[in-house]
């Protein structure tokens, strides 16, 4: 007799589904910001790169110095009377001699005829600085590029030839700007120009003809003299619905997801690596020159060209509600010595900073200073903020509760209309999760932010994760989640779980996949929802799953019970192997493995330095259905903790015991294949 499956509709259990269920989360990870969503083509245009970003980086990273034979030029770095004290470094070009010296008139003539003088223009006769962009600059036929630069010429006016250089080293477009005379401590002048790459077949669209993929911006100095340079910028003029400073094809990929909300800026970016790296929203608005740069927790640089104002404009353009996230007065817990709080004496000022964001979004620009700044940037009407996230993956201890409660109470008192989203740690289980939920219930936090990065098998095995959530307690925002790969099985596992989130849409109020963007060749995390390079956008299976749910929304869920065979049993491999990985430093002593039949294997001590997987010498072919691992572990420091993987560690299914992250122990079953997917 064939198996029979009976489905029964539970009419009494009808539930309303949140109208804000499906959204997106943008964090500047994997070059998502500068070099990604930010349309700026110049890398390190403010000359602020330094060793805090990467040990090998300096003020001239991404710049190439060109000094032709017969010329003399020295390129230095200054800090005297800068354009902006927030970003004090600038380039100094000291041009002592130019081979075949030119005048300003000859520089203009050279720019006018640059396209016909292709051979000589490959190597300029005068000293030059050339910016290589982010993996090269893509130039498109018919596109107009807006150029700007701050200059300070010492003693006399000096011309600067500006050229867009193609893959073959020849100019595609050129012009000349002239810096007026000043002095070493004098006034700066911002110069602007536009450069258009002409073509009879041109159309200034994101898919216009690409004529260079490894292009560059070249600044040529045709006359002797000294000139200071800062905040060099080059942006294509094409936009998505007039949204400036954003790469249009990436915005289009976001808009096509039809997100109900967008979370920003993080993630770990929010509270940073230490208080000096903490994200302060008010330092990311106003003139870009006065937005203090900082290192990025993911290993590069943040210019904050896409700051909070640009974020709100992006939300407005794609029809998503903003969900800004601010630190809970704590730095990130994923550092060697754990989180550091904002000092109590500084908490009143920090609370004012939090309240200021709400005013920036919602207050009347005629009566509020923060709203007046919004209006000065071009947006008189409010942004209609509804949600505010406080904290991210925090260690839920007494200090966190103290700082969070102060902020939470202040927001409730000043703005009862704002829905606060709290945090319950980095995983859907463990100490932070349990304590976070307990505190959220006690404090009456409206929504809590859960995170869950898991194997495909975990999602299939935990479809009931929200079935038994307390309907009278805080609602859930699954703010970061994803299945560990980009294969079809991963998209299917996410789709299955999203269906159950929709079924529980009365308590799961919001959800967003993470991370959102990743630039090929610069991935800090994998998988991601949208991959890109300088030319194209790539959408893996998970993207289409997100789009499917967001474009086929429901408002009511009817629970269904199933009677009959609903699972398929698959045997798991019983291979026994061991490895240690993770980013922390730890010593393993008295290491041993014992199987259920009494086989005892002594393993060598390991001093793990956090620099890659270390395999343990387990006898080849060892197999067991159950076994015990013993070790004395001394944990020192490092990001993300350390993990002992056991089982079929080179296959698709194994166990992982993680130590140190949040100063706790977590045991999970890892799996990327069908064996754990049933």
How does the language model describe each region?
Residues 1-303, 321, 336-348, 386, ...:
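Extracellular and organelle-lumenal recognition/adhesion modules and their flexible linkers in secreted
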Residues 3-11, 70-79, 245-249, 305-311, ...:
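Alpha-helical scaffolding within the catalytic cores
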Residues 20-26, 262-264, 322-324, 386-390, ...:
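Hydrophobic faces of well-ordered beta-strands that scaffold small-molecule active sites
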Residues 24, 47, 149, 258, ...:
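Conserved, mostly hydrophobic/aromatic
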Residues 27-29, 264-269, 327-329, 390-395, ...:
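Active-site beta-loop-alpha junctions enriched in small/polar residues
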Residues 221-222, 230, 265-268, 325-333, ...:
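Active-site groove signature of glycoside hydrolases
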Residues 314, 409-412, 416-419, 437-442, ...:
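Catalytic-core region of carbohydrate-active enzymes that cleave or remodel glycosidic bonds
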Residues 333-342, 349, 377-382, 425-457, ...:
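Substrate-binding cleft/loops of secretory-pathway carbohydrate-active enzymes
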